[in-house]
Regions:
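A short, exposed loop/beta-hairpin motif centered on an aromatic-Gly-Thr core
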Residues: 19-32
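Short aromatic-glycine-(Arg/Gly/Cys) micro-motifs in beta-strand/loop hairpins
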Residues: 2-21
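Short, charged, surface-exposed hinge/linker loops at domain edges
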Residues: 1-7, 36-62
Length: 62
């Protein structure tokens, strides 16, 4: 299983998810979508099956 750190910040009406190891980011409309959006981004970027992607919440800024 691949594990990645994420940093999440509030940006207006969106949540911005930063994935430092990949130098990328994605956005979620609702907090409940953050984990899925991060895992999807990582899976696509690394060509790893989504069920093999784990995330570690490093920082969450409201």
């Amino acid at each position: 299983m691949s594990s990645f750190d994420i940093d999440v910040t509030r940006d207006g009406g969106w949540w911005t998810v930063h994935i430092p190891e990949l130098g990328g980011q994605t956005r979620a409309r609702y907090p409940r979508e953050v984990e899925l959006m991060a895992r999807e981004y990582i899976a696509i970027s690394t060509r790893t099956p989504i069920d093999q992607v784990a995330i570690n919440w490093r920082r969450r800024t409201l």
